[in-house]
Amino acid sequence: MFLLHEYDIFWAFLIISSVIPILAFLISGVLAPISKGPEKLSSYESGIEPMGDAWLQFRIRYYMFALVFVVFDVETVFLYPWAMSFDVLGVSVFIEALIFVLILIVGSVYAWRKGALEWS
C-alpha cells in the first residue's frame, strides 16, 4: 500500500521552500518606498551624470558570438560527466554522445556558412 507519511519530509521541504520566497517578495513589496523621484529614474554610473543618451545599442554580432559560445559551453557541461564515466558506460552511450557532438558540429557549420561567426 502506498503510504503518504513516508513523504512527510518532502512535503514539508516543498511547502517551506515555496513559502519563503513568497514571504520575501511580499515583505519587500510592503516595506519598499513607493514614490520614485528623479534620482531613482536617472542613470547612475560612477557618480557622474551621463552626457547624452545613456542607452547604447550593441551590434547583433555580439549576440551571435555570445549565442554560439553558450551553445558550446552547454555542450561542455553535458559532455564532461560523460567523459568522467566513460569506462563504466557502454557502447550505446558512446554512440549517443557521438550523435550529440555530430549535431553540434552540423549546427556550427550551419552558423559558419550563414556568416554568424564573421565580424565584418
Swiss-Prot record:
Please list the reactions this protein catalyses.
a plastoquinone + NADH + (n+1) H(+)(in) = a plastoquinol + NAD(+) + n H(+)(out); a plastoquinone + NADPH + (n+1) H(+)(in) = a plastoquinol + NADP(+) + n H(+)(out)
Q: Summarize the subunit comment.
A: NDH is composed of at least 16 different subunits, 5 of which are encoded in the nucleus.
What is this protein's record name?
NAD(P)H-quinone oxidoreductase subunit 3, chloroplastic
Keywords from the UniProt entry: Chloroplast, Membrane, NAD, NADP, Plastid, Plastoquinone, Quinone, Thylakoid, Translocase, Transmembrane, Transmembrane helix, Transport
Q: Spell out the subcellular localization from the entry.
A: Plastid, Chloroplast thylakoid membrane
What EC number(s) are associated with this protein in UniProt? 7.1.1.-
PANTHER family tied to this protein: NADH-UBIQUINONE OXIDOREDUCTASE CHAIN 3 (PTHR11058:SF9)
Gene Ontology annotations for the cellular component aspect, listed alphabetically: chloroplast thylakoid membrane; NADH dehydrogenase complex
- Which family is this sequence assigned to? Belongs to the complex I subunit 3 family.
Q: What is its main location?
A: plastid
Q: Which domain of life is it from?
A: Eukaryota
**From the Swiss-Prot or TrEMBL record, what is one GO molecular function term?**
quinone binding
Function recorded in the entry: NDH shuttles electrons from NAD(P)H:plastoquinone, via FMN and iron-sulfur (Fe-S) centers, to quinones in the photosynthetic chain and possibly in a chloroplast respiratory chain. The immediate electron acceptor for the enzyme in this species is believed to be plastoquinone. Couples the redox reaction to proton translocation, and thus conserves the redox energy in a proton gradient.
The record's Gene Ontology biological-process terms are: photosynthesis, light reaction
Please report the record's description of how this protein sits within the membrane: Multi-pass membrane protein
Q: Which residues cross the membrane?
A: 9-29, 64-84, 88-108
